[in-house]
């Protein structure tokens, strides 16, 4: 069952797309959008998680704004104009809403993010170690100038990066992985050979959709989340 819901966000209100599994209950997973906004591809990912037994919530970090998949300039403008503090509040509020929802089970909240959402998934994991226990970022991570205080990060991170990615380079992913491993964090950032940025995205806006790789990765994501959250 899918619905648009509202939730408190630090004295204000935000909205999101909530999908429950057929049984109505399961562990909670936050799904964080790409730079386009809360689009059909992100809703599809939430639905796929629900089909695998999770209660999935994708918060609308652009508060109703949306770029079409051929509007890259608009998508970039939306991403760069999004107030970081508001996005942090919205993600945190979404996590609390999800954790308190009837039917959400398990030991904590999982986070899956794509592109911009991959980057943000690292940030919310570092900010909310009290709730976030498992993170799967896809082709996105914070650049050095945006890195948070990693000291409180306790979630297990299993990231999936692209080999050919000018937005989030494999070299940057390797450097971040080495840094976090050096701090004793449980993290792996796998670079998938032959892939380009957004290789999981069904909209295929960059012409980089790789269905073969996606078919291998997705069951791993589901198994990882069940292992950490059930």
What is each PLM-predicted segment?
Residues 1-230:
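N-terminal cap/leader regions of alpha/beta-hydrolase-fold enzymes
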């Amino acid at each position: 069952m899918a619905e648009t819901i509202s939730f408190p966000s630090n004295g204000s209100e935000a909205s999101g797309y909530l999908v429950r599994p057929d049984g109505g209950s399961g562990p909670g997973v936050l799904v964080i959008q790409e730079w386009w906004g809360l689009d059909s591809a992100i809703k599809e990912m939430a639905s796929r998680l629900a089909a695998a037994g999770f209660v999935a919530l994708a918060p609308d970090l652009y508060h109703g704004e949306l770029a079409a998949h051929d509007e890259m300039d608009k998508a970039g403008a939306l991403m760069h104009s999004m107030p970081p503090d508001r996005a942090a509040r919205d993600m945190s509020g979404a996590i609390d809403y999800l954790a308190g929802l009837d039917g959400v089970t398990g030991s904590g909240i999982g986070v899956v993010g794509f592109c911009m959402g991959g980057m943000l998934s690292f940030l919310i994991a570092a900010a909310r170690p009290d709730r976030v226990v498992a993170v799967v970022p896809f082709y996105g991570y914070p650049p050095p100038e945006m890195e948070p205080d990693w000291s409180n990060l306790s979630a297990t991170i299993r990231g999936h990066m692209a080999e050919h990615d000018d937005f989030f380079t494999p070299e940057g992913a390797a450097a971040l992985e080495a840094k976090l491993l050096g701090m004793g964090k449980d993290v792996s950032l796998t670079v998938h050979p032959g892939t380009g940025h957004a290789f999981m995205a069904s909209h295929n806006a960059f012409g980089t959709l790789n269905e073969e790789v996606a078919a291998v990765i997705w069951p791993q994501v589901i198994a990882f989340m069940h292992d950490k959250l059930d």
